[in-house]
Amino acid sequence: HLQRRRQRQMCIRDRITSCVISLLANSCGFEFNLPSIDEEIRINEVIAEKSWEKLFNDKVGFISNNISNPELIFPGSFNPLHEGHIKMKELAEKKTGMHTTFEICARNADKPPLTFYEIKRTIDQFQNDESWMLTSAGRFSEKAEMFPNSVFIIGADTLMRVFDEKFYDSHKNMMEHIQRFNDHNINFLVFGRKVNNNFISLKNINVPDIIVDRCTGIDESLFRDDISSTEIRMTNN
């Protein structure tokens, strides 16, 4: 019985491998037929737009569906975009009087780059009146250089990582990156987040003195949404 199960598992692996090889070959212009299997195979094909290719080839720093310079920027993966994101956007716009641009980073320092399928799936979530941009700026200090005089919508958990030395070469290096927020006139609207079953807001974060005046917290009474995109993905799966 154990031997038969192993053989069945090997057969399944071989078929999956053949499917992957076939798709890779076809994407490179070669013919390689899919194996004959009982299951229905659905293939979603995404052809990269020329602007996406330019971004990944470092020909441009960002691409956007809006010709105006972004002022209020909401970085995130938006996988998926949910009601909490929309509420944050609305509150930030009311607070600043600015129009939000959602920012999706195609290449984060601590994550694999987004696939073209993931890029299309993310962009397709936004409504026609919503602005978005795809960037190559993984660090907030890089975003600051790319979009000076901007306000960033940020969760308290993300802001904690911005001030965490382990993401830098040294304390001096961290402070050099943080100084760029002053150099490029960057401000932050900080929304509270649930971290390890505790609600963390701006007042719980040790913000360096040199930019403490650039951070404005949104009170928990105005916004609290403990649902995360990760939890939504787990529920959907």
Set out the residue ranges of the language-model regions.
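Histidine-anchored nucleotide/phosphate-binding helix
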Residues: L81-T96
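Amphipathic alpha-helical segments that form well-ordered structural scaffolds
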Residues: C19, L23, M88-L91, Q125, ...
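Single conserved hydrophobic/aromatic residue that forms the stacking wall/gate
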Residues: H1-D14
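Short, hydrophobic/glycine-enriched beta-strand segments
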Residues: P70-G76
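Non-catalytic propeptide/linker segments at domain boundaries
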Residues: C28-I67
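Phosphate/dinucleotide-binding and metal-coordinating scaffold of catalytic cores
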Residues: F102
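Ampiphathic alpha-helical segments that act as solvent-exposed interaction surfaces
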Residues: R13-N33
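Active-site cores that bind ATP or allylic diphosphates and position pyrophosphate for catalysis
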Residues: P35, R42-I43, E49, N69, ...
